[in-house]
Amino acid sequence: MNRIRIHVLPTNRGRITPVPRSQEPLSCSFTHRPCSQPRLEGQEFCIKHILEDKNAPFKQCSYVSTKNGKRCPSAAPKPEKKDGASFCAEHARRNALALHAQMKKTSPGPVGETLLCQLSSYAKTELGSQTPESSRSEASRILDEDSWSDGDQEPITVDQTWRGDPDSEADSIDSDQEDPLKHAGVYTAEEVALIMREKLIRLQSLYIDQFKRLQHLLKEKKRRYLHNRKVEHEALGSSLLTGPEGLLAKERENLKRLKCLRRYRQRYGVEALLHRQLKERRMLATDGAAQQAHTTRSSQRCLAFVDDVRCSNQSLPMTRHCLTHICQDTNQVLFKCCQGSEEVPCNKPVPVSLSEDPCCPLHFQLPPQMYKPEQDLDVVGDGMQCPPSPLLFDPSLTLEDHPVKEIAEGPVDILGQMQMAGDGCRSQGPRNSEKAPAPLPQSGIATANGKPEPTSVS
């Protein structure tokens, strides 16, 4: 017998057929750093680094920025013309949008003749003048125009759409200031900067309004506090703030803490001046220059009141009073009131630096006369006379003792008598030379010990 051999082939039942893997695109061959972007078809670089290949059909984008004058570094396909402009994908899209918007602006509206031509097909002619041929031609023309109008109708633009009832959005806050970029998905850098700038300006204005509101509330609460304090002071008196007499131990402790808190909150010296300058700058920035000028003028005015009217004079530097009312300041030491005279008292302020007891010009006391008048001077001889010198001091005017005055005038008389005697002797000649000269009257000369000493001329 012949044996029949049957070979059973293995089946694929129960086995998972391998799925052919799709070939992954090769990455960019940029050498300076690894780039994971896929290559362009038929090229070795991606769209970002395709300009590294000089033989690739790409060149640099022709767009030049108007702000900084730099050229776009992206790649753009080479145009057919050698000198033609070529843009990258982003700038090509922007250029297309700009051209589309410009075409919308420059496209003229529907002309009246065009509208009449389109509506002429619906005009009914008179019944008597209509013939079968004309009716057939008219019918065909109407069908042609209807088919043309249905097939070639232009799409409706945004300006031609129905805007709806304008009062429907009356309750919306942003209806008057609708942002055209509110629902945009992608923003440029300029648009983002503009949006953030507007938001920051709006936030700044809101902060300023809130700060002014808080200032108003602070002033109102301070006014109420001062009013309540005044009412309490009038009703209870100032004993609670001036002295601890009649208070309990706890109340005295609270009063002590209150005084310490007041001293702690108060500023002194340089800190007070700097705080005042800071406050003036803030007022100038918030309330404006007019309020600051008014505050400065009011702070420079004198604080004195004359007949219930405030003095309008400008105060002196570092003080709150003018020159007329500076003596009302108990802390100043540079001015004193004029004493005046017993009959007419005077209260005019005078600087202390002039003298210990200053006086105004009206009550100023002249010093005693210290120089000898011209008519009281004794001229000796017939020579040239010089004007009196202010250095000639006459001590006799200040001497109150008469004997001492006579003693002081003694040498002057002796010199005069000696000159007269000499002239007489020269006039008598030798005949009187044998006679004894007439004795001169003795006069006293003041010595060092103050006693007169007799003198004689031989």
From Swiss-Prot:
Region (Required for interaction with other NSL complex members): 308-364
Name of the encoding gene: KANSL2
Major localisation: nucleus
Example of a GO biological process term: chromatin organization
Compositionally skewed regions (Acidic residues) per UniProt: 167-178
Cross-link (Glycyl lysine isopeptide (Lys-Gly) (interchain with G-Cter in SUMO2)): K78
Keywords: Chromatin regulator, Isopeptide bond, Mitochondrion, Nucleus, Phosphoprotein, Ubl conjugation
Region Disordered, residue ranges: 126-182, 419-458
Bias kind Basic and acidic residues: ranges: 135-144
Record protein name field: KAT8 regulatory NSL complex subunit 2
Modified residues (Phosphoserine): S147, S149, S168, S172, S175
Function (record text): Non-catalytic component of the NSL histone acetyltransferase complex, a multiprotein complex that mediates histone H4 acetylation at 'Lys-5'- and 'Lys-8' (H4K5ac and H4K8ac) at transcription start sites and promotes transcription initiation. Required for NSL complex stability and for transcription of intraciliary transport genes in both ciliated and non-ciliated cells by regulating histone H4 acetylation at 'Lys-5'- and 'Lys-12' (H4K5ac and H4K12ac). This is necessary for cilium assembly in ciliated cells and for organization of the microtubule cytoskeleton in non-ciliated cells.
UniProt GO cellular component terms: histone acetyltransferase complex; mitochondrion; NSL complex; nucleus
